[in-house]
């Protein structure tokens, strides 16, 4: 996996070196059913000044934002974020949702709810669950680029979660490997290599985000077409080029910064036909709606 990690770091550096163009945010962000595939050209820009009580502009290129999420969606928001040198997201508390910062490139300072601060860089993963606080600062000389993914479980016992005090910081060195053959309900080919902050087997019923991993598909390997019954699964491409298949059987070529998702009742698949490794984030989240809740 060392070779894969070096390839990811190089790709991240190249991906963030050039100018990226994205369309402006829609004039109105309203709840609607999101699509399954957002290539880079589909992302829209929304910037926030002083995010979390911080300083400077938090630049965001989004597949979709929380204002567009349905009540029953587990994953509420996915964005590629940039903090310029000297900018920071202030330390703030999450009341009823979960927020993961997954570092792509640059260096920053992540602060957790206990006031502990760590230098974070490419590949490090962080999370704030209900009742926890976090902040992120760019004190370096280059842009700090990271994925920001927000999820929510409406039936979570918030008071219980606030007392649990689960881990918030997962450096590359603490992540663990787990590889799967024929991924996708046994329908895939080859091996899906994974390096995880945590996996679904260790998740509690209350937690919305069940799993975060950095995955690799080698040439000729694939995740077979499979359906998600009661959770959301997003593949976010970091480097390489692959072919994503949605529930309707439509194939789309996906590359760096592409965002894909399958919700409850939806199917998806991903394959790598190229020589270069296909590296992506795989995040699984689940929302158990409260009784009687509708869209």
List the predicted regions and their residue ranges.
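Conserved short histidine dyad/triad with adjacent acidic residue
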Residues: 62-66, 79-94, 198-200, 213-228
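Bacterial N-terminal signal peptides that target proteins for export
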Residues: 1-8
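Short beta-strand segments in beta-sandwich/barrel cores
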Residues: 87-89, 106-111, 221-223, 240-245
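Bacterial N-terminal signal peptides
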Residues: 9-17
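Glycine- and acidic-residue-biased ligand/ion/polar-headgroup-sensing regions
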Residues: 96-108, 230-243
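A short, N-terminal "cap"/entry segment at the start of jelly-roll beta-barrel domains
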Residues: 21-75, 122, 156-209, 224, ...
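Ligand-binding loop in jelly-roll beta-barrel domains
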Residues: 130-156, 258, 264-290
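Short acidic-glycine-tyrosine-enriched beta hairpin
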Residues: 115-130, 249-264
């Amino acid at each position: 996996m060392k070779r894969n990690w070096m390839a990811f770091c190089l790709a991240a550096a190249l991906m963030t070196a050039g100018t990226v163009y994205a369309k402006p945010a829609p004039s109105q962000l309203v709840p609607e059913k999101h699509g399954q595939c957002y290539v880079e050209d589909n992302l829209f820009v929304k910037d926030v000044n002083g995010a979390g009580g911080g300083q400077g502009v938090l630049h965001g290129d989004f597949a979709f934002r929380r204002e567009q999420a349905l009540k029953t969606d587990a994953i509420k928001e996915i964005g590629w974020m940039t903090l310029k040198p000297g900018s920071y997201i202030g330390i703030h508390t999450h009341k009823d949702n979960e927020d993961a910062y997954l570092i792509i490139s640059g260096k920053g300072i992540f602060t957790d709810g206990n006031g502990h601060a760590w230098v974070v860089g490419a590949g490090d993963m962080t999370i704030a669950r209900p009742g926890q606080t976090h902040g992120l600062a760019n004190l370096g000389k280059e842009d700090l680029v990271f994925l920001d993914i927000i999820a929510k479980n409406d039936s979570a016992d918030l008071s219980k979660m606030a007392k649990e005090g689960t881990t918030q910081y997962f450096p590359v060195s603490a992540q663990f490997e787990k590889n799967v053959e024929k991924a996708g309900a046994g329908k895939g080919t080859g091996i899906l290599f994974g390096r995880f902050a945590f996996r679904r087997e260790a998740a509690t019923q209350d937690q919305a985000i069940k799993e975060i991993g950095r995955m690799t598909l080698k040439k000729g390997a694939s995740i077979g077409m499979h359906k998600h019954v009661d959770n959301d699964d997003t593949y976010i491409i970091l480097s390489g080029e692959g072919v994503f298949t949605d529930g309707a059987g439509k194939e789309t070529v996906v590359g760096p910064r592409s965002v894909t998702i399958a919700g409850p009742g939806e199917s998806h698949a991903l394959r790598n036909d190229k020589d270069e490794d296909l590296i992506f984030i795989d995040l699984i989240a689940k929302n158990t709606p409260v009784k009687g809740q509708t869209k």
